[in-house]
């Protein structure tokens, strides 16, 4: 799979983010050009289009629903200590609730906050002291780990459904005879 080529006019967010191209494929990133308080609106998502299938650049908006951002927001990488939250229920990108954003900060979000499963899982190298290692989507993560993060409503709903379908711990035989 080759690195994608943007089809939108760049820069798409010249006042708020700068794309930094890496020396090798898949190493581009985005840096903040603004300082904002925790929880502040960073950007609305206004250029997205439905994605006919899940890709490594798509963002999940609901069960079986994905979009392509069609903007430089696609360069916001994953981090286990994210600087942003992608709220797909409001199509807004906000500064993480637990810390402010400074000029020069890398723009990142916690991919499992939007993704139930991923077409291209990867080993995380975010460098956070809380780095989780393999990132493959929220369906493969422990609820106790996910509880430390802000999650989109569709991910919370899918997690609730998953917890309801987990088999009981009991090894006793259950009789269904009337």
Swiss-Prot record:
Coiled-coil boundaries: none
Domain of life: Eukaryota
Pathway named in the protein's UniProt entry: Secondary metabolite biosynthesis; terpenoid biosynthesis
Residues annotated to bind Zn(2+): 124, 126, 131
EC class of the enzyme, as a word: transferase
Gene Ontology MF: a single term: methyltransferase activity
Swiss-Prot/TrEMBL GO biological process terms: methylation; terpenoid biosynthetic process
Catalyzed reactions: L-lysine + 2 S-adenosyl-L-methionine = N(6),N(6)-dimethyl-L-lysine + 2 S-adenosyl-L-homocysteine + 2 H(+)
InterPro entries on file: Flavunoidine_N-MTase, Post-SET_dom, SET_dom_sf
Keyword Lipoprotein: no
Domain Post-SET as annotated: residue spans: 120-136
The entry's keywords: Metal-binding, Methyltransferase, Transferase, Zinc
Entry EC no(s): 2.1.1.-
Known function: Methyltransferase; part of the gene cluster that mediates the biosynthesis of flavunoidine, an alkaloidal terpenoid with a tetracyclic cage-like core connected to dimethylcadaverine via a C-N bond and acylated with 5,5-dimethyl-L-pipecolate. The tetracyclic core is synthesized by the terpene cyclase flvE and the cytochrome P450 monooxygenase flvD.
Assigned protein family: Belongs to the class V-like SAM-binding methyltransferase superfamily.
Name the UniProt record assigns to this protein: Methyltransferase flvH
Organism expressing this protein natively: Aspergillus flavus (strain ATCC 200026 / FGSC A1120 / IAM 13836 / NRRL 3357 / JCM 12722 / SRRC 167)
Species lineage: Eukaryota, Fungi, Dikarya, Ascomycota, Pezizomycotina
Originating gene: flvH
């Amino acid at each position: 799979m080759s690195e994608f080529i943007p089809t939108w006019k760049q820069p798409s967010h010249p006042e708020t983010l700068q794309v930094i191209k890496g020396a090798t494929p898949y190493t581009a990133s985005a840096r903040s050009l603004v300082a904002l308080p925790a929880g502040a609106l960073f950007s609305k998502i206004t250029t997205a289009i439905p994605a006919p299938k899940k890709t490594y650049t798509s963002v999940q908006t609901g069960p079986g629903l994905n979009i392509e951002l069609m903007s430089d927001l696609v360069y916001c990488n994953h981090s286990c200590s994210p600087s942003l939250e992608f709220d797909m229920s409001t199509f807004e990108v906000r500064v993480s609730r637990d810390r402010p954003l400074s000029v020069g900060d890398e723009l990142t979000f916690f991919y499992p906050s939007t993704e139930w499963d991923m077409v291209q899982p990867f080993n995380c190298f975010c460098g956070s002291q809380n780095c989780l290692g393999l990132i493959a989507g929220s369906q493969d993560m422990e609820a106790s780990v996910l509880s430390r993060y802000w999650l989109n409503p569709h991910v919370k709903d899918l997690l609730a459904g998953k917890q309801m379908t987990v088999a009981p711990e009991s090894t006793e035989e259950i009789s269904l005879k009337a």
